[in-house]
Amino acid sequence: MSEDHFDDEHEGHGGGGGSRHPMAARFRGYLPVVVDVETGGFNSATDALLEIAAVTIGMDERGFVFPEHTYFFRVEPFEGANIEAAALEFTGIKLDHPLRMAVSEETAMNDIFRGVRKALKANGCKRAVLVGHNASFDLGFVNAAVARMDMKRNPFHPFSSFDTATLAGLAYGQTVLAKACQAAGIDFDGREAHSARYDTEKTAELFCGIVNRWKEMGGWEDFDD
């Protein structure tokens, strides 16, 4: 199914059409929302979702975008979830840490989706599009969680995304998040990496920097459809 065909079938889903709003005009009715997940492995169907963060994107009166609001949750593994020891070693997540204070997948996803729907309404957008660094990985885990819980109101487009690894490769010649941030002049602390919150906020800075740089270069103007 093409993106346009999906949009036609879901025209009214997700909040107020309003292409007059500058954010809706900039991204064809989509609201970029940056997402990062930390997981128990690479398989979204079998491996645990352990952390998830999302950053909604705002736009100022000049048409420049900025990271607006962060949502972050440590997540309890779903029943029967696989967790690879190598994944925990890589992320540094300690499941038994007394301050981990994890919530269920349902709580995490519902709270994030509620915030995203609020941002959709505020920006006159009909649907969110996931922004991620290697976005297909994050989108796969979001979609798997939605399917596990049989959630009916997923504000994210099910297959379209903006990948900052690709965008940063184009803009800066770097595809690794830390190196792309360095090339973009964004501070990046490797000791904080592989926290969903930290990586999401840095990815949001990177995405906004690329979009704004393109605007400054005259690469986008607000044309009516």
UniProtKB/Swiss-Prot annotation:
Gene3D superfamilies, A to Z: Ribonuclease H-like superfamily/Ribonuclease H
Residue ranges occupied by any Exonuclease domain in the UniProt entry: 33-207
Annotated site, Important for substrate binding and specificity, chain positions: F42, F90, F137, F159
Swiss-Prot/TrEMBL cofactor(s): Mg(2+)
Cofactor descriptive note: Binds two Mg(2+) per subunit. The active form of the enzyme binds two Mg(2+) ions in its active site. The first Mg(2+) forms only one salt bridge with the protein.
Residues binding Mg(2+) 1, per UniProt: D36
Active site: H194
One biological process term in Gene Ontology: tRNA processing
Pfam family, one: RNase_T
SMART domains for the chain: EXOIII
Keyword Nucleotide-binding annotated: no
Function: Trims short 3' overhangs of a variety of RNA species, leaving a one or two nucleotide 3' overhang. Responsible for the end-turnover of tRNA: specifically removes the terminal AMP residue from uncharged tRNA (tRNA-C-C-A). Also appears to be involved in tRNA biosynthesis.
Subunit structure: Homodimer.
Name used for this protein in its record: Ribonuclease T
Gene behind this protein: rnt
